[in-house]
Regions:
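C-terminal binding/interaction regions
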Residues: 107-108, 232, 242, 246
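A ubiquitous short alpha-helical element
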Residues: 29-34, 67-74, 166, 204-208, ...
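Extended intrinsically disordered, low-complexity coil regions enriched in Ser, Thr, Gly, Ala
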Residues: 78-101, 115-128, 212-237, 249-262
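Acidic, glycine/proline-rich low-complexity segments that act as flexible tails and inter-domain linkers
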Residues: 8-64, 84, 116-197, 227, ...
């Protein structure tokens, strides 16, 4: 005897009009196959990520800032598939190629080329598919001779005068790493044009929050953000907008680091 089981959807949640419109703006004319294979999931996710989160009172960000944070977060959590899908959407929302490339370059100092290489390749592919001529105009502002000095100045500008001699501090066997932080991390990347210090600190915050396991550095860069004008409320908005892409544990860890940094800066 043939038994036929009918699968009945018990709790239907229609996708909101705002979510539909936002999705259409991100992916014009595209209909996800997940609507067929995973309808319950996609209804809940789309309504949350593309309506509830975006429209949460007091937690919104300008489009450019929001997309910078999301792309940096996806690089940090190694979400290459989602990054490739959303990069075009970020451009449709107005994020310029120079800023996109600078986010990717900035990531190398915090994630290493081993994790950033796929994102650099994907970025180049998407940009060229959209008619962007590569290479873009150069943004480097330092030379071999002055990168350490300029990097140190960037550290001082962001974190304060206490960083002036950091490059020559530390135990003899490892002080070269502090030197590299000055000449490479800050001298080669932070000194570039294309992103402001505030934008670089925000993207760095997103890299660290998304990769997890580096809370001391995340707390330090939360403090750096506050020093360059990205206050506690702003960082909470960044965490909120990126939460759908990294989940609750890392978002809550990031929030704890922001609270710790804000308390320290208030003393």
């Amino acid at each position: 005897m043939l038994t036929v089981r009918l699968r009945i959807r018990r709790f239907f949640m229609p996708i909101t009009q705002f979510s539909k419109d936002y999705h259409e703006k991100m992916f014009p004319g595209y209909k996800s196959d997940f609507l067929r294979t995973d309808p319950e999931f996609i209804e809940r996710f789309d309504n949350f990520a593309f309506d509830e989160v975006i429209n949460q009172e007091g937690q919104g960000l300008p489009d450019e800032t929001r997309w910078m944070a999301i792309l940096a977060t996806l690089i940090g959590c190694q979400g290459i598939d989602e990054y490739e899908k959303l990069l075009g959407a970020a451009m449709d929302f107005g994020l310029e190629p120079v800023k996109i490339k600078e986010i990717v370059y900035q990531a190398v100092a915090y994630l290493g080329i081993g994790r950033v290489f796929p994102f650099l390749k994907a970025t180049n592919t998407v940009l060229e598919e959209r008619g962007v001529k590569l290479p873009l105009e150069g943004q480097a502002m330092t030379t071999t001779e002055n990168r350490r000095e300029m990097g140190t100045q960037a550290q001082v500008d962001i974190f304060g005068e206490g960083m002036r001699d950091f490059w020559k501090s530390g135990p003899e066997e490892s002080k070269h790493i502090n030197y590299w932080l000055a000449d490479n991390c800050f001298g080669d990347y932070y000194t570039r044009t294309g992103l402001s210090y505030a934008e670089r600190e925000m993207t760095t915050f997103c890299f660290l929050a998304a990769q997890g396991g580096c809370e001391p550095q995340l707390t330090s860069h939360a403090a750096g953000n506050i020093k360059v004008g990205n206050d506690k409320a702003f960082l909470i908005r960044v965490i909120s907008q990126c939460l759908p892409y990294i989940g609750y544990p890392r978002s809550l860890n990031a929030l704890a680091c922001v609270n710790k940094a804000a308390e320290s800066e208030a003393k």
